[in-house]
Amino acid sequence: GTTWMQEITYLIYTEGDFEGSDKTPVHDRFNFIELNFEHPDPNVKVGLKRLEAETPPRLLKTHLSSNFFKKTLEKKKTKFIVVFRNPKDMLASYYNFYKMASFQFDSNGTWEEFFERFKNDKIVHGNYFDMQLSWWAYRNDPRVKIFKYEDMLKDPEQAVRQVAAFLEKDLSDDLIQKIVERTSFKSMKKNPMLNYSKFGGMDHKISPFMRKGQVGDWTNYFSKEQAKLVDEISAKKFETEGLYMEDGM
């Protein structure tokens, strides 16, 4: 859901810059701040180096917990849009990304091996439950807007309108509809500026970056025991904090 929300945010923030969306890959329009590598072009900065080189307002992307942004959150100048997804569907999606992205460690592993990594907090970015809870703690902060992937799928237009309201952008109904259409899964899947087909290090023959865009695909991967374990963790960590996630069942 990250790329989906990025494109929605970009088109709203720029008030319909479809030309920019058509010409510039989404990973160039948003600085992925935790990236840490030297770009082949010495004039191109990435991650924190790019962050330091640019001045606000900026569009940023991160998979980090809110713990990394406590000082920023305290200043109340930056807005955060956070997308949650059911942990079982997240794991199924991440497993396929894990396989197709050559820059991931041990990307040729089986689902069972990947699930063991998850159980032992050995996947990139660590414990998914703790990460979501770190942002859930800010659910009443007026500068933090939390979306659930499942709700976005149910009512894409409502999601677009909520992002527009959060960013204080008064857009026409016509532009809202155009953004909804442009950010549909069908449209994004075939858009080379969004589907990472031109991005190195990803083998789309193993798995496309944009696969299905639906709820419940986890049932094609999880054993009953694995599903039970994740449900138990969700109940213990999420539901005790008032966070409930749909799993398509």
Enumerate the predicted regions with their spans.
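An amphipathic alpha-helix signature
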Residues: 88-91, 157-164, 173-176, 227, ...
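PAPS/PAP-binding and catalytic site of the sulfotransferase fold
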Residues: 3-15, 147-171, 179, 187
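Short, solvent-exposed coil/turn elements at secondary-structure transition points
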Residues: 65, 86, 150-152, 182-185
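Catalytic lobes of large eukaryotic enzymes
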Residues: 117-118, 165-208
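PAPS-dependent sulfotransferase catalytic domain
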Residues: 2-147, 193-249
